[in-house]
From Swiss-Prot:
HAMAP family attached to this UniProt entry: NrdR
Location of the ATP-cone domain: 49-139
Entry similarity comment: Belongs to the NrdR family.
Descriptive protein name: Transcriptional repressor NrdR
Taxonomic source organism: Opitutus terrae (strain DSM 11246 / JCM 15787 / PB90-1)
UniProt GO BP: negative regulation of DNA-templated transcription
Zinc finger intervals, unnamed: 3-34
Function: Negatively regulates transcription of bacterial ribonucleotide reductase nrd genes and operons by binding to NrdR-boxes.
Length: 152
């Protein structure tokens, strides 16, 4: 792993921890050149999963794209990186259990929304606004109203 400070590739692993769900490993590393300490996260690379978009196009599944979307929804919310990582892994595990090699994008969006709803309602509405392509404020109001009804 390349040191983010001096770019040396010589380092040693100081500590390794497996995540609660068991699908990622966090490693604490120390650069042997400059002594800088940094963390890395390792996860299983899932090959061959194709997402079927709404318009029928197909593209390779990108964990990073999903992570970026969830991070954007959770920006400046009381949701930590570990919660986001667990959400992503949970969604991916669920999708792999229900689908073989092709996953409809709607299934991904629905799975994320279901988990965000119970995690953080503001993040849920943010994600829903992009996923459902809200065009005006009335659509936000409808989603917020529906969210309030589901809570009761």
């Amino acid at each position: 792993m390349r040191c983010p400070k001096c770019t040396s590739i010589e380092d040693k692993v100081i500590d390794s921890r497996i995540s609660k769900e068991g699908s990622t490993i966090r490693r604490r590393r120390e650069c042997l050149e400059c002594g800088y300490r940094f963390s890395t996260t390792e996860s299983l690379v899932r090959d061959g999963i194709v997402v079927i978009k709404r318009d029928g196009r197909r593209e390779e599944f990108s964990r990073d794209k999903l992570l970026h979307a969830v991070r954007a929804a959770c920006h400046k919310r009381p949701v930590d990186v570990e919660q986001i990582t667990m959400l992503i892994e949970d969604v991916i595990d669920m999708l792999e259990a229900h689908y073989d090699s092709e996953i409809p994008s709607a299934a991904i969006g629905d799975a994320v929304m279901q988990r965000l709803r119970s995690m953080d309602q503001v993040a849920y509405v943010r994600f829903a606004s992009v996923y459902k392509e809200f065009r005006d404020v009335s659509e936000f109001m409808q989603e917020i109203s529906a969210l309030g009804k589901k809570e009761k």
